[in-house]
């Protein structure tokens, strides 16, 4: 059963400006620990791709907060949702702290997709009720 759907789109240039204005602290505020490692690696290899990664993760967090219907307030916090990639490239969510407990208690799971193209980043999240007794 679908609980909620959320979408977010943003101009990468605006995120770049905020990143520059905060001297990089924006990434520390937004990204979870595993996302931060990926971001730092990508940023070191290619600055533009690193910022695109940050933008897609920002969009995923915004879309997720809309899908669960609570906005950006507890149990949702910037760093408590991580969007990581499986070896195949498929994006998957992981939860930290209070959000992990919230998702487990509700028996919800999130399905996420992210994309970026030159100046825009987008994410869509669908939150569903897990079927009891299912591993999926």
From Swiss-Prot:
<keyword id="KW-0963">Cytoplasm</keyword>
<dbReference type="InterPro" id="IPR002582">
    <property type="entry name" value="ACPS"/>
</dbReference>
<comment type="function">
    <text>Transfers the 4'-phosphopantetheine moiety from coenzyme A to a Ser of acyl-carrier-protein.</text>
</comment>
<protein>
    <recommendedName>
        <fullName>Holo-[acyl-carrier-protein] synthase</fullName>
        <ecNumber>2.7.8.7</ecNumber>
    </recommendedName>
</protein>
<feature type="binding site">
    <location>
        <position position="8"/>
    </location>
    <ligand>
        <name>Mg(2+)</name>
    </ligand>
</feature>
<dbReference type="InterPro" id="IPR008278">
    <property type="entry name" value="4-PPantetheinyl_Trfase_dom"/>
</dbReference>
<keyword id="KW-0479">Metal-binding</keyword>
<keyword id="KW-0808">Transferase</keyword>
<dbReference type="Pfam" id="PF01648">
    <property type="entry name" value="ACPS"/>
</dbReference>
<dbReference type="GO" id="GO:0008897">
    <property type="term" value="F:holo-[acyl-carrier-protein] synthase activity"/>
</dbReference>
<dbReference type="InterPro" id="IPR004568">
    <property type="entry name" value="Ppantetheine-prot_Trfase_dom"/>
</dbReference>
<keyword id="KW-0275">Fatty acid biosynthesis</keyword>
<dbReference type="GO" id="GO:0005737">
    <property type="term" value="C:cytoplasm"/>
</dbReference>
<keyword id="KW-0460">Magnesium</keyword>
<feature type="binding site">
    <location>
        <position position="62"/>
    </location>
    <ligand>
        <name>Mg(2+)</name>
    </ligand>
</feature>
<keyword id="KW-0276">Fatty acid metabolism</keyword>
<dbReference type="InterPro" id="IPR037143">
    <property type="entry name" value="4-PPantetheinyl_Trfase_dom_sf"/>
</dbReference>
<keyword id="KW-0443">Lipid metabolism</keyword>
<dbReference type="GO" id="GO:0000287">
    <property type="term" value="F:magnesium ion binding"/>
</dbReference>
<comment type="similarity">
    <text>Belongs to the P-Pant transferase superfamily. AcpS family.</text>
</comment>
<dbReference type="GO" id="GO:0006633">
    <property type="term" value="P:fatty acid biosynthetic process"/>
</dbReference>
<keyword id="KW-0444">Lipid biosynthesis</keyword>
């Amino acid at each position: 059963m679908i609980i909620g759907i959320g979408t977010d789109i943003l101009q990468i240039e605006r995120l770049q400006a905020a990143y520059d204005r905060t001297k990089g602290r924006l990434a520390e505020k937004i990204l979870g620990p595993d996302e931060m490692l990926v971001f730092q690696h990508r940023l070191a290899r290619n600055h533009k791709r690193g910022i695109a990664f940050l933008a897609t993760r920002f969009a995923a967090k915004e879309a997720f907060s809309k899908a669960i219907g609570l906005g950006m307030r507890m149990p949702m916090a910037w760093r408590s949702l991580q969007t990581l990639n499986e070896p195949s490239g498929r994006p998957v969510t992981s939860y930290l702290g209070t959000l992990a407990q919230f998702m487990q208690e509700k028996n919800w799971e999130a399905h996420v997709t992210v994309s970026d193209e030159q100046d825009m980043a987008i994410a869509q999240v669908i939150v569903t009720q897990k079927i009891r007794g299912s591993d999926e």
